[in-house]
Amino acid sequence: MSTDLELLAAYKPVIMQDKKEPFIITAMGCTIFRETKKSDSFPKREIVINKKEVDFAIEYAIWYDFDIQHLYELEHVWVYVDYHGRVIKVEASFHGKFLNMVDLDNGELILENGTHPVVYAQPGKHALVPDPRVIRVIPAWLESCQEMAGADGVLVQDMFADQIHTDEDLQKMTETYIKEVFGFKPSMEFVPFTLENEKLMSWEELKQSIPDRVNKQIAVIKDYFHK
């Protein structure tokens, strides 16, 4: 396990966040792929390991307690490493899909200290892009942080449907809470957020903790309206 933790720390991504971003990353759930296999945390995709070039890939499932439009968020970075320990490809999640993380001007990887991918988070929404210029072409990127804040209430993914529950009242409370407490105007100035190594964990550990994390925030929201 210690070897795995050292590996996870060695390739941990640097997330560039807006200076006014109201949410922080509180955990990364990690999976090391040494062969082609379907992702458990991003079930719509298979992580393909071309053994001629790739020794392993690390999936970082990035946890936020909130998205600016709904309760809780999970984004992903995939780092592909060759047999010499060099990063040869980086992908990251973008609104349910994924993009290659390369410099838009020269197509090269963007790495800090040679092994840490640098990616940019859409303000409030946290979709990941390789260049902050891309954010301005995303529909409603600004409105989602202001008048559209909280619009989606509590999201309940199928894998947690038996442990996270919502209703019409909670949906309305969550929308109002997010808009009142977290609504903001992005600065479009970005600063690095690097998660402490002790907050790296296996995906299974993070997955097991998610219902408790979400239900704690639901309790905070309910308290907000019943002071």
Describe the role of every protein-language-model region.
Residues D4-V90, F98-L99:
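Short N-terminal edge-element motif at the start of the domain
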Residues L71-H76, Y83-K227:
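Domain-length functional cores that host ligand/cofactor binding and catalytic or interaction surfaces
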